[in-house]
Amino acid sequence: MMQRSWQSWRRGLTLGLASRRSYVASVEAPSTPPEELDAFERDYLKQRIEITPFQKLLLGAGSSIASLLDPHRHDMIACLGETTGESALWNILDSMQATEEGRRILKDKPRINTKTIDFKRLEALPPNTFGATYAKFLKDNKVTPDSRMEVRFLEDPKLAYIMTRYRECHDLVHAALDMPTNMLCEVAVKWVEALNTGLPMCYGAAVFGAVRLRPRQRREYLKRYLPWAIENGKGMRPLMPIYWEQRWEQNIHELRCELGIKPLQ
């Protein structure tokens, strides 16, 4: 009954939001003059869905409930990240602007997908490089960088890019941490990301994801994975200012040492 009620509520809200797409063009212009916007920002403002504070509250509450009922609802998890993460995204923006590498990312706005990355080149790199490690991670876990949801609800295009960057770098973080995509490792990675980025969505996924672990997994999680994730999340360098695409040929062990990543014992 609760599932049916949620689906009905979501359909109504989605229709209401979709009807507002035409409104986006008529809202007041962004603080940055249109001619000064880059390609990502222009494209984002065309597809952004404008929402009121009340709709944002409803989306945040509804998506959190839906994510708890079904952790595989990636659309709801993405929605939760956008409606609850604005403050953390501003902090991430500050951390990226504070480093030369982070500023280059904000200027270039690179994207990570099969159209922008030459994966055959990565596969041909020596096996001890970060690029080869990432390519092997994707192949071993049968995942693709093209599966990430587009950002829709954030008002500021700068924050929209940072959220996009976070999503597209998630698998890179998995590879750097040497964590596959099973439930236990996914929860551990979410703890690392939560402590490293401050995104509320990551905290929620880490806490409630752990609840769904099987008894044997939970014992292993509490004994090894959680302490490891907390130590790394607190001790690592900020990950969002890392220009991963310019580190494909870097030795993976040297990269982990540079970032402060400690291996799982």
Swiss-Prot record:
InterPro entries: Coq4, Coq4_euk. Its cofactor is Zn(2+). It catalyses: a 4-hydroxy-3-methoxy-5-(all-trans-polyprenyl)benzoate + H(+) = a 2-methoxy-6-(all-trans-polyprenyl)phenol + CO2. Its main location: mitochondrion. Zn(2+) binds at H170, D171, H174, E186. Pathway: Cofactor biosynthesis; ubiquinone biosynthesis. Disulfide bonds: none annotated. The keyword Nucleotide-binding does not apply. Residues 1-30 form a transit peptide. GO terms for cellular component: extrinsic component of mitochondrial inner membrane. Pfam families: Coq4. Keywords: Lyase, Membrane, Metal-binding, Mitochondrion, Mitochondrion inner membrane, Transit peptide, Ubiquinone biosynthesis, Zinc. It is a peripheral membrane protein. One of its GO terms (biological process) is ubiquinone biosynthetic process. Its EC number is 4.1.1.130. It is an enzyme of class 4 (lyase). It is found in: Mitochondrion inner membrane. Component of a multi-subunit COQ enzyme complex. Belongs to the COQ4 family. Lyase that catalyzes the C1-decarboxylation of 4-hydroxy-3-methoxy-5-(all-trans-polyprenyl)benzoic acid into 2-methoxy-6-(all-trans-polyprenyl)phenol during ubiquinone biosynthesis. HAMAP family: Coq4. This is Ubiquinone biosynthesis protein COQ4 homolog, mitochondrial. The lineage of its organism: Eukaryota, Metazoa, Ecdysozoa, Arthropoda, Hexapoda.
